[in-house]
Regions:
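Oxyanion-binding/catalytic loops of NTP- or PPi-dependent enzymes
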Residues: 6-222
């Protein structure tokens, strides 16, 4: 059974060697969203509950930006890029880049020269995207993570007040609005001590045993 990235991160960080506590792992990856409530300590990692959304992830954020850029270009230039696969791929790549930049900056420039040609005249996509606009475009996606968080807490038989830590996993958790939503949902400052992308890579690379929802922190398998 594949060892999930969040559990591997806990093991790799040594969190499982401290005092017993319950933690919530909020894992927003590229294509899926997973949340787990895990009890750790005494070299043991026990999964108390899991929930999630298999149709929610960072790719959806990219798609929202892409659609906005294409719609704005169509409005100003009267050109529908959706009919041009090559142009759309360029816009998608620019959208993903913009998402990453807006995780640390309030604005970013969109610059795609020669994105289209109309009657022999080249058209360029040049505009500014703000973090505020990005959040407006994606807030409903972020709010969709609330249901699984509440479900996992309920299934574990605890409330957010019982959590000792909230751990963010997955590159999309770098989005500031995601961080704020997790803080709102749990009433706690989410931990960014672990590299979200490294957690995912680690979990994908390592296989381990999972028996009765418990993982012995010292065991490893090829």
């Amino acid at each position: 059974i594949g060892l999930v990235g969040s559990e591997m991160c806990i093991r790799d960080s040594g969190l499982d060697h401290g005092e017993p506590q319950k933690i919530l792992v909020y894992d927003l990856g590229g294509g899926t969203f997973d949340v787990s409530v895990i009890e750790i300590g005494d070299n043991l990692i026990e999964v108390l509950a899991t929930a999630g959304d298999n149709h929610l992830g960072g790719d959806d954020f990219d798609a929202r930006i892409t659609e906005y850029l294409v719609s704005e270009f169509q409005r100003t230039e009267r050109v529908d890029l959706r009919k041009d696969a090559t142009a759309m791929q360029r816009v998608r790549e620019e959208a993903e880049k913009a998402k990453k930049v807006l995780s640390s900056s309030s604005t970013t420039g969109i610059n795609l020269p020669f994105i289209a040609t109309v009657k022999g005249e080249p058209k360029h996509m040049e505009m500014t995207l703000t973090r505020a606009k990005f959040e407006e475009l994606t807030m409903d996606l972020i709010e969709r993570t609330a249901g699984p968080v509440q479900q996992a807490l309920s299934d574990a038989g605890i409330t957010a007040a019982d959590l000792g830590m909230v751990l963010l996993v997955g590159g999309s958790t770098r989005v500031p609005a995601v961080f704020e939503e997790v803080r709102r949902l749990t009433g706690k400052e989410p931990s960014r001590n672990l590299n979200p992308d490294e957690c995912v890579a680690l979990g994908a690379a390592v296989q381990g045993g999972k028996l009765g929802g418990a993982l012995m922190a010292g065991s490893q398998a090829a």
